[in-house]
């Protein structure tokens, strides 16, 4: 009986050891104390706290490095783990191949090269080079002298700032007119956003600009892969919408005007004219407003609660009459009316309202 009890206890102990090995949290690898310098540490399922100086660290998946107050990290290579730069901490010459570099308020990342992954900034990112991946500037965070190369994306959120940006050919900027300040150069010249006004923005390759209510955008170029979104009460004039560029707007915008492949287009005083929607573009015609001679190209969408005439719904485009869905808020209108529509292998859904003189070609409709 005693022997059986011993065997049970041994088995229980082994089970506990196995469970601990399998499910224990990441072990704390090391602490670099004030005044101490370490070189060439590889972090993989380890955590390093840096109060002193850490040089040539490699952070692999599962690894973490925390740069504490007055700590310094130099020439760190991040290959899938995390580097946190805390208040008064500094990271210099980091290379981000995957994973995250997170700059907290009061921290600084200097001359990071971003090949992939995410550099998230609540503090300061100075002179980063964005070759791939995404640099995200959060509220009250900032970046200066950022270079965005082909395949890279700089995102500046409301209340964030990006100064002296060098947007190279193929680089992308995603932002809003509520950013604190954004300025720099692109292949078309100088651009800026400040006090709710955006000038000369170039949107391409995943870049976008959101023009908020009562804000303005002037002379925006929406090239292939770019998106211009104008909210109700927003204004965008001088828009140059090229092939592959996308516009998302409603007839409640104060004014949206410019050129596309059809020539001049405009939305003003509740009337949309000659608006062509490319792949991914969208138009919402609100009640008591109208759209004239709208073209929906492949994968574009149009929702009409008002009146539209001469609408063309091309292959794989979708038109909805009498119903709109705005961020999950669904509205119906029996007053909606569509006249002289041509459906050319696209799809038109009648939820409410009236259709008059419709021409259907192809298999859909």
Name each region found by the language model:
Residues 27-31, 35:
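Boundary at the C-terminal end of the N-terminal hydrophobic targeting segment
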Residues 1-26:
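Bacterial Sec-dependent N-terminal signal peptides
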Residues 34-39, 45-47, 52-57, 63-65, ...:
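The right-handed parallel beta-helix/beta-solenoid scaffold, focusing on the short coil/turn
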């Amino acid at each position: 009986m005693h022997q059986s009890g011993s065997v049970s206890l041994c088995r229980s102990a082994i089970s506990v050891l196995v469970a601990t090995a399998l499910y224990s949290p990441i072990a704390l690898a090391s602490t670099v104390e004030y005044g101490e310098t370490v070189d060439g540490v590889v972090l993989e399922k380890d955590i390093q706290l840096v109060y002193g100086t850490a040089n040539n660290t490699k952070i692999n998946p599962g690894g973490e490095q925390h740069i504490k107050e007055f700590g310094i990290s130099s020439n760190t290579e991040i290959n899938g783990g995390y580097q946190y730069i805390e208040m008064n901490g500094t990271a210099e010459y980091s290379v981000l191949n995957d994973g995250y570099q997170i700059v907290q308020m009061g921290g600084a990342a200097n001359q990071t090269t971003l090949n992939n992954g995410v550099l998230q900034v609540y503090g300061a990112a100075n002179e980063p080079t964005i070759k791939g991946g995404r640099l995200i500037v959060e509220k009250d965070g900032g970046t200066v002298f950022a270079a965005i190369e082909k395949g890279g994306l700089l995102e500046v959120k409301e209340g964030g700032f990006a100064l002296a940006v060098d947007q190279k050919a193929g680089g992308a900027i995603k932002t809003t007119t509520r950013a604190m300040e954004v300025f720099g150069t692109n292949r078309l010249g100088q651009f800026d956003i400040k006090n709710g006004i955006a000038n000369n923005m170039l949107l391409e390759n995943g870049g976008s600009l959101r023009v908020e209510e009562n804000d303005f955008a002037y002379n925006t170029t929406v090239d292939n892969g770019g998106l211009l979104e104008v909210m109700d009460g927003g204004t965008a004039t001088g828009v140059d919408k090229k092939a592959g560029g996308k516009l998302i707007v409603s007839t409640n915008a104060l004014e949206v005007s410019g050129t596309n492949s059809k020539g001049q287009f405009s939305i003003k005083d509740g009337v949309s004219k000659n608006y062509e929607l490319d792949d991914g573009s969208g138009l919402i015609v609100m009640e008591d407003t109208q759209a004239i001679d709208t073209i929906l190209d492949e994968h574009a969408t149009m929702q009409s609660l008002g009146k539209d005439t001469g609408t063309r719904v091309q292959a794989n485009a979708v038109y909805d009459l009498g119903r709109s869905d705005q961020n999950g808020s669904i509205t119906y209108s029996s007053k909606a009316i569509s006249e002289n529509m041509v459906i050319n292998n696209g799809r038109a859904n009648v939820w409410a309202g009236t259709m008059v003189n419709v021409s259907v070609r192809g298999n859909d409709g």
